[in-house]
């Protein structure tokens, strides 16, 4: 059986490794530990996705509920509960999930990856080299770039972390003249403040003065002063990291695949990083299974992964663009001006339009492989809809175009009829006295 090596043990790499194990593949994963102790705010949807991917140990004691405050465009409100994910605990749990699933986990830094006709040679610091028939690149933003992809405005996030007094768990986000800040406080007193700024327009001081510069920014924020209180902020640790949105130009070949931030990394305002990583990774085991066991479908499998990643990236990017556009006070400031129009002017969620529906053959996931099937292309789903609650909709829509709807529904069970009628209405269908006469 093919030797598969996954590089990176974040959510994306772990999800792919676990998915491959469920398909019966032996998997080796190579990773080094994070260089800083991060905290991430995630939604219930993200926690559910992590559990569905089999990451149970990763979530044990790693997430604490918090009511998030929002101060945006001069308006304050409390949003839904978010969960603060302690990344060091989460990452330790990920490795435990992997080991329990039978994944060989190697701790070490990858020095080089060399490809040849025989596969891959992976050199690891302090260890013997590995050989692989198939490579999964999941090292996030640290993955080597592959040519010039789509990039958003150059952005950097400055994370400040310090130990405060124990208290209640809380989190907040606010827009600022030259960027935006996310802040969090854990019950044990660990405090986090992350300021995201524009690389080209903000003149940041040198590293020696950067901590004080960040401190002055917090002092100028009424929300931050209230959130963290007047207590001293001793021994603040600073970590700067790129948060520019990046889409890799190619994310899949015949014997390799990129997932998570290595495939697409988006602005942290556009959505949660963990969820974005999972979004591009959960489909990867089936893509890999197809490439290895049905090589005649290689082009179809590559097309499936490439298009899914591209559409996910654009959807997240447009969501972030709309958040930036909501801030009206500093429209002309470089940070806000650059981000309120990128990546394009296309709406994030297109309105339903029954007249715009069409049917095309597209790649789908069927029985553990990428296959081709007729799907319904909609304004909001350019990759198509194959099933709705288990009901294949393209054949039924073809009949709706040429037959009375009641005749189409007559062949369905009551539950299927309810599902299909609901889907038709959601796509803008309105009953009319005569059929449209449209062909498919």
State what each model feature region is.
Residues 1-12:
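Beta1/beta-strand and adjacent pyrophosphate-binding region of the FAD-binding site
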Residues 9, 18-39:
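Glycine-rich FAD pyrophosphate-binding loop
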Residues 33-69:
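N-terminal FAD cofactor-binding segment of flavoenzymes
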Residues 77-97, 202-206:
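Short beta-strand to alpha-helix junction loop
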Residues 99-229, 247, 264:
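Predominantly flavin-linked oxidoreductase catalytic cores and closely associated redox partners
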Residues 112, 129, 207-321, 328-329:
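FAD/FMN-dependent oxidoreductases across multiple families
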Residues 303-359:
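Mid-to-C-terminal Rossmann-like scaffold of FAD/NAD(P)H-dependent oxidoreductases
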Residues 337-399, 418-433, 437-440:
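Acidic, low-complexity/disordered tracts enriched in E/D and polar residues
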């Amino acid at each position: 059986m093919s030797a598969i090596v996954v590089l990176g043990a974040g959510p994306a790499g772990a999800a792919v490794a676990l998915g491959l194990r469920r398909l019966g593949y032996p998997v080796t994963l190579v990773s080094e530990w994070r260089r800083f102790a991060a905290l991430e705010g995630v939604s219930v949807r993200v926690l559910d996705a992590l559990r569905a991917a089999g990451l149970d140990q990763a979530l044990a004691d790693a997430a604490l509920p918090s009511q998030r405050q929002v101060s945006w465009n001069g308006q304050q409100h409390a949003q839904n509960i978010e969960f603060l994910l302690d990344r060091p605990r989460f990452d330790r749990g990920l490795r435990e999930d992997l080991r329990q699933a039978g994944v060989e986990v190697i701790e070490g830094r990858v020095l080089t990856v060399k490809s040849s006709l025989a596969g891959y040679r992976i050199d690891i610091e302090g260890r013997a080299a590995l050989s692989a028939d198939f490579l999964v690149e999941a090292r996030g933003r640290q993955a080597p770039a592959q040519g010039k992809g789509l990039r958003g405005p150059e952005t950097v996030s400055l994370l400040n972390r310090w130990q405060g007094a124990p208290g209640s768990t809380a989190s907040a986000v606010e827009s600022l003249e030259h960027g935006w800040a996310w802040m969090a406080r854990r019950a044990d007193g660990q405090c986090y403040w992350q300021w995201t700024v524009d690389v080209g327009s903000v003149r940041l001081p040198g590293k020696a003065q950067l901590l004080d510069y960040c401190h002055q920014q917090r002092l100028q924020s009424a929300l931050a002063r209230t959130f963290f209180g007047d207590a001293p902020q001793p021994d603040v640790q600073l970590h700067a990291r790129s948060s520019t949105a990046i889409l890799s130009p190619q994310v899949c070949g015949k014997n390799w695949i990129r997932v998570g931030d290595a495939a697409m990394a988006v602005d942290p305002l556009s959505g949660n990083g963990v969820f974005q990583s999972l979004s591009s990774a959960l489909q990867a085991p089936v893509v890999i299974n197809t490439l290895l066991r049905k090589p005649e479908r290689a082009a179809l499998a590559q097309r499936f992964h490439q298009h899914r990643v591209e559409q996910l990236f654009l959807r997240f990017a447009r969501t972030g663009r709309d958040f930036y556009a909501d801030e009206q006070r500093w429209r002309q400031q470089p940070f806000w001006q650059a981000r309120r129009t990128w990546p394009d002017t296309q709406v994030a969620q297109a309105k339903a339009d029954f007249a715009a529906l069409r049917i095309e053959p597209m790649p789908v996931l069927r029985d553990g492989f990428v296959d081709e099937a007729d799907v319904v292309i909609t304004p909001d789903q350019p990759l198509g809809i194959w099933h709705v609650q288990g009901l294949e909709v393209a054949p039924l829509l073809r009949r709706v175009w040429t037959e009375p709807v009641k005749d189409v529904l007559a062949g369905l069970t009551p539950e299927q009829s309810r599902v299909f009628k609901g889907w038709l209405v959601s796509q803008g269908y309105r009953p009319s006295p005569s059929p449209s006469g449209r062909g498919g």
